[in-house]
Amino acid sequence: MEPGLQQAGSCGAPSPDPAMQVQPGSVASPWRSTRPWRSTSRSYFYLSTTALVCLVVAVAIILVLVVQKKDSTPNTTEKAPLKGGNCSEDLFCTLKSTPSKKSWAYLQVSKHLNNTKLSWNEDGTIHGLIYQDGNLIVQFPGLYFIVCQLQFLVQCSNHSVDLTLQLLINSKIKKQTLVTVCESGVQSKNIYQNLSQFLLHYLQVNSTISVRVDNFQYVDTNTFPLDNVLSVFLYSSSD
């Protein structure tokens, strides 16, 4: 072919548009475009699975701790000869479960009160103490915990009434509680009042423990007879 024709042929051939030129491998395939989404979904799956496993493990640990706590709780279902109403039963159970049972007592108030110094039923529970004429007499020296609870029933008239509860050691007041009821002067059928007092005191041998009230006629021995109690136990022995 002549040189002129070759030049014309080469000039007549359309040259490719630069905009239409695509580098090899630069065309994204549909499979290649979904790879980032798959990677993200896998990350979320692994994260949620790990969180679920941690939650299951935490619940299992909590259940194990609860079961161990229940197993370590002492069984206090032993039947007691005396049954109270509000807290006297719990107090009696606490006394029975004390580590030191060398000296303790649990007494209920007598229904036949005729003195400000209260008397107690002699058929109560007494260990290491002697009961005589309203007194508990100490037989072992040491630190004693004393608690008394009384229920009062007052029929108000036109004057106020003072209710007292006094804990005495060797006939001397060591702790007392005073409550005034019927202050308004308005007549009412019944007013129930609970008084309680406790004392932690070191006692020698032959020391006496007693309880005194000013108005013994208001001590309610009928409605809640089992809630009028005196409890004593040796907290710490000196021997």
UniProtKB/Swiss-Prot annotation:
Disulfide bonds join 156-182. Residues 103-230 form the THD domain. GO terms for biological process: CD8-positive, alpha-beta T cell differentiation; defense response to Gram-positive bacterium; immune response; positive regulation of transcription by RNA polymerase II. Residues 68-239 are extracellular. The chain crosses the membrane at residues 44-67. InterPro entries: TNF_CD30_ligand_type (IPR021185), TNF_CS (IPR021184), TNF_dom (IPR006052), TNF_ligand_SF_member_8 (IPR053104), Tumour_necrosis_fac-like_dom (IPR008983). Signal peptide: none annotated. Residues 1-43 are cytoplasmic. Residues 1-36 are annotated as: Disordered. It holds the Pfam family TNF. One of its GO terms (cellular component) is extracellular space. GO terms for molecular function: cytokine activity; tumor necrosis factor receptor binding. Keywords: Cytokine, Disulfide bond, Glycoprotein, Membrane, Signal-anchor, Transmembrane, Transmembrane helix. It is a single-pass type II membrane protein. The keyword ATP-binding does not apply. Glycans are attached at residues 75, 86, 114, 158, 194, 206. It is found in: Membrane. Belongs to the tumor necrosis factor family. Cytokine that binds to TNFRSF8/CD30. Induces proliferation of T-cells. Homotrimer. This is Tumor necrosis factor ligand superfamily member 8.
